A protein has these predicted regions:
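A solvent-exposed interaction/effector surface
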Residues: 1-207
Length: 207
């Protein structure tokens, strides 16, 4: 049976619908950086997703099986979001978003395996995949919650997370390298907006 990160690490991918505190360890990802409104038709965000998935499936379907290889389900899309000059995120200013789109990598994928996948995808697709990065990141202490509903309704969930964190003796901590983080568990093309499942995670620190 294929290894499914969502099922094996439910604490990180299926938190309750009420806020909780969690410590997230270091992980490796495929990543593409960009800026602008993610809803823009044929915009940078949608192009980034195309590149991410192309490389993710190149790795999964590769005939080359590196040391430590195991069959797995490609993990869900994730995103880091911020805006210059704003502490947190302002959902009314989508054009100002800076973002990093992510797909988690299995532990057996080294930088060498990543480089091979970029080369293979570029040759097969006749496309430049150089914007895709090997991204290592340790998220650390966070507050998180499962948000169910449209993305534009997220501020209500985010406010509840901030209130919970404060009540537990924590403060939000959008410092260098710490961002608003979302994990997308639903296919937006097939799921009604009111049923979309999104893990929302924000960095905190003890006060």
């Amino acid at each position: 049976m294929s290894f499914d990160y969502k099922k094996e690490y439910k604490k990180f991918y299926f938190p309750p619908k009420t806020p909780t505190i969690v410590t997230v360890p270091a992980m490796n990802f495929l990543a593409v950086r960009g800026q602008g409104d993610p809803n823009q038709e044929d915009g940078a965000y949608k192009k980034a997703l195309g590149m991410l998935y192309a490389v993710a499936y190149t790795i999964k379907m590769s005939k080359h099986k590196p040391e430590g290889y195991f069959d797995y389900v490609v993990p869900p899309l994730e995103g880091l979001w911020w805006q210059e000059g704003i502490y947190g995120v302002d959902y009314t200013r989508k054009a100002d978003f800076q973002w990093v789109s992510l797909i988690r990598l299995p532990e057996f994928v080294t930088r060498e395996e990543f480089d091979l996948a970029i080369e293979t995808a570029s040759e097969k697709k006749q496309h430049d995949f150089s914007p895709v990065e090997f991204f290592s990141w340790e998220e650390g202490l966070c507050v998180q919650c499962m948000h169910i509903g449209p993305y534009d309704d997220e501020p209500v969930t985010v406010a509840a997370m901030a209130d919970y964190a404060k009540a537990q003796g924590y403060a939000l901590d959008f410092s260098q390298g710490r961002f608003h983080h979302e994990i997308y568990l639903s296919d937006v093309r097939r799921c009604k907006p009111e049923k979309l499942k999104t893990v929302i995670r924000q960095p905190v620190k003890c006060v």
